[in-house]
């Protein structure tokens, strides 16, 4: 089940980043060194009242003029409207209501998306009356907070989670495998989706997707029920490349967050780029099921070793996710396109797999017998037992004497044992080590 997305919108210097970091707490961390993935704090996981959600800070670079500020805020608001389940609109209680605030409020009102209006920098009771003028925005009662002091955050979060769907309401979509087609523009993502829809000749309905430019295509085939999401995004030109790049990353992240299977589509002639590595790195960090589809394979001159060598080169560049599945196709000619959905279903089945506790502990016991944990600081890791606590992705908890005694190479060894024993091919898995007394 994907987590709700909460997007923060507001002018520069109203305290969005302070609020973002306060809510994220210690949850933002570098889990591992994944090549090509920048930790620019675009997103963070958070939780309130046992509801987990993803926060996205839409703020980009700091503009220099008021005209640019308004343009940037329009973009922020548009992105939030496109992809968020709930929008948090942050305004400055000390500076007061501005024309830019009013313009963005108008966009948010028209969107019909849930909006929580937050008046920041109200750090003492005497400033409460500063919030009254924000009623003029017409988007509900303002909630006063001080992000820097942590005041009022509980009231704000209570309001945010009110708008989340009850998990049971999402059960209908749960029978569909949600696939995000990700990758740079012009690699053939849309052509590929059209080819899949055109070839299958089945029940297809189009419903508005998470982004204004994309349509979620519902598709039923002999391989299963699928939702195909094209992450094309906006194609507006901008003088500020960094800003557009950030917004592109935010959009793609949101699509991956809501997906079961992430399919990175690359152009066979261009090969894989740093941007591709960054994009698929997000899916890897979230432990999604992952496929790499090399499109336009018909344009490559080949001999009997071309495909094998090309795949080895890709696997070397993407060695941080050795479990990914690879396909070489042509959306234009239809070559191997029929294998995409069956491979996605295979990856999804592994992503959804549950392992019995008995079998799991047998495998772990044998793995430890074959290779003992190394000694760390004169002590050795002891694994008491393990259990699977979740699927989509598969998550395991290992109860041990001291998690600090786990050497990363031994952790990798145990993960490989799980993968080989239970066939977690094509999907990320998560292993957590918890301390337990003997």
UniProtKB/Swiss-Prot annotation:
Residues 353-437 form the KH-like domain. The keyword Aminoacyl-tRNA synthetase does not apply. Residues 4-168, 177-352 form the EngA-type G domain. GTP 1 binds at residues 10-17, 57-61, 120-123. The keyword GTP-binding applies. GO terms for biological process: ribosome biogenesis. Disulfide bonds: none annotated. Keywords: GTP-binding, Nucleotide-binding, Repeat, Ribosome biogenesis. It comes from the Bacteria. CDD domains: EngA1 (cd01894), EngA2 (cd01895). GTPase that plays an essential role in the late steps of ribosome biogenesis. Belongs to the TRAFAC class TrmE-Era-EngA-EngB-Septin-like GTPase superfamily. EngA (Der) GTPase family. Associates with the 50S ribosomal subunit. This is GTPase Der. It comes from Clostridium perfringens (strain 13 / Type A). The gene is der.
């Amino acid at each position: 089940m994907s987590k709700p997305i909460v997007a923060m919108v507001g002018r520069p210097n109203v305290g969005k980043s302070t609020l973002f970091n306060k809510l994220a707490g210690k949850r933002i961390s570098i889990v591992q060194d994944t090549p090509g993935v920048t930790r620019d704090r675009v997103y963070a996981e958070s939780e309130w009242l046992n509801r987990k959600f993803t926060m996205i800070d839409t703020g980009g670079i700091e503009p220099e003029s008021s005209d640019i500020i308004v343009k940037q805020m329009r973009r922020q608001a548009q992105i939030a409207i496109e992809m968020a389940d709930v929008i948090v609109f942050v305004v400055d209680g000390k500076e007061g209501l501005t024309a830019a605030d009013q313009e963005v409020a108008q966009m948010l009102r028209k969107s019909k998306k849930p909006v929580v209006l937050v008046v920041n920098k109200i750090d003492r009771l005497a400033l409460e009356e500063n919030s009254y003028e924000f009623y003029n925005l017409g988007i509900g009662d303002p909630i006063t907070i001080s992000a820097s002091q942590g005041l009022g955050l509980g009231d704000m979060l209570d309001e945010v989670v009110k708008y989340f769907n009850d998990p049971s309401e999402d059960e209908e979509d749960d029978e569909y495998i949600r696939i995000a087609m990700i990758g740079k523009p012009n690699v053939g993502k849309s052509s590929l989706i059209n080819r899949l829809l055109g070839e299958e000749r089945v029940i297809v309905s189009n419903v508005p997707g998470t982004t204004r430019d994309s349509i979620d295509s519902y598709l039923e085939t002999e391989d299963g029920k699928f939702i195909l999401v094209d992450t094309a995004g906006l194609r507006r030109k901008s003088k500020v490349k960094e800003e557009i790049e950030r917004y592109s990353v935010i959009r793609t992240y949101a699509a991956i967050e809501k997906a079961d299977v992430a399919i990175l589509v690359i152009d066979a002639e261009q090969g894989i780029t740093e941007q591709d590595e960054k994009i698929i790195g997000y899916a890897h960090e979230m432990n999604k099921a992952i496929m790499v589809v090399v499109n336009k394979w018909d344009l490559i001159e080949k001999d009997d070793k071309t495909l094998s060598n090309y795949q080895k080169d890709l696997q070397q560049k993407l060695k941080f996710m050795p479990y990914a599945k690879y396909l070489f196709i042509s959306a234009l000619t239809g070559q191997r396109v029929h294998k995409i959905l069956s491979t996605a279903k295979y990856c999804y089945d592994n992503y959804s797999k549950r392992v019995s506790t008995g079998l799991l502990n047998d495998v772990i016991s044998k793995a430890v017998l074959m290779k003992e944990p190394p000694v760390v600081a004169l002590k050795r890791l002891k694994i008491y037992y393990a259990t699977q606590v979740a699927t989509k992705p598969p998550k395991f908890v290992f109860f041990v004497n001291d998690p600090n005694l786990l050497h990363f190479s031994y952790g990798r060894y145990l993960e490989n044992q799980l993968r080989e024993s239970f066939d977690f091919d094509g999907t990320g898995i998560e292993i957590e080590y918890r301390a337990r007394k003997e």
